[in-house]
A protein has these predicted regions:
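Polytopic transmembrane helical bundles with strong interfacial aromatic enrichment
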Residues: 1-128
Length: 128
């Protein structure tokens, strides 16, 4: 599981850099400033959680069950939160109205919060 967690974190990190560069260069010409800021929020949260997954993968004092819970919460959260933000920010560039799926953004955010909460609780339960 450790290799999977760290690999996913690295993939999310690489994609965040690519998407950030794409937003700063290609999308800057076609998106409104407001939509560009929205897109950048998705990139930023993806990168935060890429680093978080790498941290989780490298921690040796977290049991595998806890790591697995955190992994799936963060994986799902990033895909729903950042993914929906990317689609919503670029909505004007496609014929499909992605605002119809806007409700998944807060679900993704909630999953990210749960991932951090599981991490926090596992740390608080540890005996020094």
């Amino acid at each position: 599981m450790t290799k999977k967690i760290i690999s996913t974190g690295a993939i999310f990190g690489v994609l965040a850099i690519i998407l950030g560069a794409f937003g700063a260069h290609a999308l800057k010409k076609v998106l409104t400033p407001e939509h560009l800021v929205t897109f950048e929020t998705g990139v930023r949260y993806q990168m935060y959680h890429a680093l978080f997954l790498i941290l989780i993968g490298t921690l040796t004092d977290l049991d595998e069950k806890t790591k697995k819970k955190i992994y799936y919460l963060i994986l799902s959260g990033v895909l729903l939160f950042s993914g929906s933000i990317y689609l919503l920010a670029t909505n004007d560039l496609t014929p499909f109205d992605f605002r119809t799926i806007g409700f998944i953004t807060p679900i993704g955010g909630f999953l990210l919060i749960l991932g951090w909460a599981v991490f926090l609780l596992s740390i608080l339960k540890k005996k020094s």
